[in-house]
């Protein structure tokens, strides 16, 4: 029975999405980014780390997520980003919302050729996007 149990556990592990697959060290997303939201008088800071986790500060909210991001852009020029919130301090973000642990999101990133900014879109078009996210010097948030 043990070999069968081990085989089932191995199959389950293989079937899981590669949520822990860290991006390459040269991935353009890694680093600290700021999204300014002037109409709300607020900004959000995103720190995408090399271990596949991110730390976000938005108004009073501080949250942590696990993410996966495509290594290369699609033929349309977008990087697919999948994100799952794993920690949150329960405080309101810039929009007045409170993020729920376990929330998942899939977005598509389009980088400026300079690599210094990107927009985050609902799909692989420029029809529903937020940004620009501006790269910041490496520092803690």
Regions flagged by a language model, labelled:
Residues 38-41, 58-115, 124:
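Contiguous, well-ordered beta-strand patches that form the walls/edges
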Residues 29-30, 46-54, 70-73, 110-117, ...:
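Short, solvent-exposed coil/turn segments at beta-strand boundaries
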Residues 5-15:
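Bacterial N-terminal signal peptides
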Residues 48, 100-101, 127, 135:
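Secreted/processed peptides and extracellular or luminal domains of membrane proteins
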Residues 124-141:
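C-terminal partner/receptor-binding element of secreted or periplasmic proteins
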Residues 19-34, 47:
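N-terminal helix-cap/turn-to-beta initiation motif at the start of protein domains
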């Amino acid at each position: 029975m043990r070999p069968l149990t081990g085989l089932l556990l191995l199959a389950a592990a293989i079937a899981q999405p590669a949520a822990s697959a860290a991006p390459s060290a040269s991935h353009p997303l890694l680093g600290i980014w700021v999204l300014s939201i002037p109409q709300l008088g607020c900004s959000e800071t995103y720190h995408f780390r090399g271990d596949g986790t991110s730390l976000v500060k938005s108004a009073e909210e501080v949250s942590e997520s696990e993410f996966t991001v495509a290594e290369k852009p699609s033929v349309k020029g977008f990087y697919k980003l999948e994100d799952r919130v794993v920690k949150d301090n329960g405080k309101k973000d810039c929009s007045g919302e409170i993020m729920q642990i376990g929330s998942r999101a899939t977005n598509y990133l389009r980088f400026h050729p300079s690599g210094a900014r990107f927009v985050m879109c609902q799909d692989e078009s420029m029809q529903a996007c937020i940004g620009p996210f501006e790269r910041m010097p490496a520092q803690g948030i």
